[in-house]
């Protein structure tokens, strides 16, 4: 009886999720190509609660050329993550516009836009399966050399090669059998496999030692100079 009650509650919640309507949708005739990695914030104001008067971002005017590398710093809660979330259109601006590749992000097909804007967060998700299975979320039908190259740039090869089964080593749900730094490096490699025009690293090397962090940043500058970072 207890299991039936729990199953019924779970089924109800699943149905609610399936019936949920997306707040962010593409236009009837969306753009299906991102020309380059240029990013423009034109007088952007953003609030999580529309009409509340509580502005997370106010009148942001920022222009980043394709292939340029910039860093955004600030205290906790100042809106850094909110700012980058607008680039991949996880939220819509309250006023102003965000452009990627010279076009307003609201004009793109969502899958097209998000395939070209790779985001690596401080805490990322690894799935049950092998190391290679997790990398394939970045590129499903890639060659083994491509997976190795991405891991080399992210300095993930340093620990993968020491695993008993290498790229066939098992990853527990959530990457429970890997350290924080190892998970971050795998997620960076996975993002690189998408070959994005924009790569956003949101405190994504916080669990990596200083020397490895420097190696990753140097490799990103050398190997993918055309990607906006």
Regions found by a protein language model. Give the residues of each.
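ABC-type nucleotide-binding domain
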Residues: 32-229
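Pre-NBD coupling/linker segments of ABC/ABC-like ATPases
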Residues: 23-34
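Cytosolic ends of transmembrane helices, especially the final helix of ABC transmembrane type-1 domains
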Residues: 1-17
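An intracellular "coupling" helix at the cytosolic face of ABC transporter transmembrane type-1 domains
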Residues: 3-6, 23, 47-52
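Conserved E/DxxT/N motif and adjacent residues on the DHp alpha2 helix
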Residues: 16, 23, 136
